[in-house]
Amino acid sequence: MLKLGVHKTFKGKRLYTEVWKDVVGFEGYYQVSNLGRVRGLDRIIEYEDGRIYYMKGGMMKTTINNKGYESLRLSKNHTRYNKTVHRLVIEAFIPNFDNKPCIDHINGIRTDNRIQNLRWVTYKENMNNEVIYYSQHYFILSVYTIVLSG
């Protein structure tokens, strides 16, 4: 089920429509938006000893992992899972018809998890992104697709 909302960005100067979808594998627990945000849903947790706990939903805080991607920890059935935000976004919004294993950040910014910045790619396509590393910053020279004729 899609839920629409309005999300203010950059000091309220621009409004975007934010679309929410359930996180694949965590339906009823978490949702992810087309803008790359993740929220937990209100739910009731029942422990094995019979205790019942009401958990209020809200926006999830993310951290930057050692590869520079936004990540977070999701819980389901008393088990915790480490997930990257870009994978949650693309799995919810873009079908992987060609079964490509990698996700490419088109503009090269690993923390930009908006749906329009993500695409499914092969390992080879992912390696074709020319990147210049300068100090601790990186810049994409070009993103291109190889077309084979013959």
How should these model regions be labeled?
Residues L2-I103, G108-G150:
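Conserved recognition-core residues within compact binding domains
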